[in-house]
Amino acid sequence: MLKPLGDRVVIELVESEEKTASGIVLPDSAKEKPQEGKVVAAGSGRVLESGERVALEVKTGDRIIFSKYAGTEVKYEGTDYLILRESDILAVIG
């Protein structure tokens, strides 16, 4: 399993709908980049200049919304993930 370092989290993307409300099927090229995902792993936290470690506000299992162009896409064991910094997370769902 991927283990993120510091203030980074590993996200499994939640794919958007493939059809519009009127039933039109969208090709991959017309879909927007997903901004929602599920945290599958979280780093140990951010280190302050004083050396103190601050724990992350998100945890494994949280559903989140993140900045549109944030993070680095990686493929691991056939699954697509996104690794991003906690500061790129905009909200936790639920």
Swiss-Prot record:
Gene Ontology CC annotations of this record: cytoplasm
Main location group: cytoplasm
Presence of the UniProt keyword Cytoplasm in the record: yes
Keywords linked to the UniProt accession: Chaperone, Cytoplasm
Family: Belongs to the GroES chaperonin family.
Subunit structure as annotated in this protein's UniProt entry: Heptamer of 7 subunits arranged in a ring. Interacts with the chaperonin GroEL.
Name of the protein in its database record: Co-chaperonin GroES
Organism: Bacillus licheniformis (strain ATCC 14580 / DSM 13 / JCM 2505 / CCUG 7422 / NBRC 12200 / NCIMB 9375 / NCTC 10341 / NRRL NRS-1264 / Gibson 46)
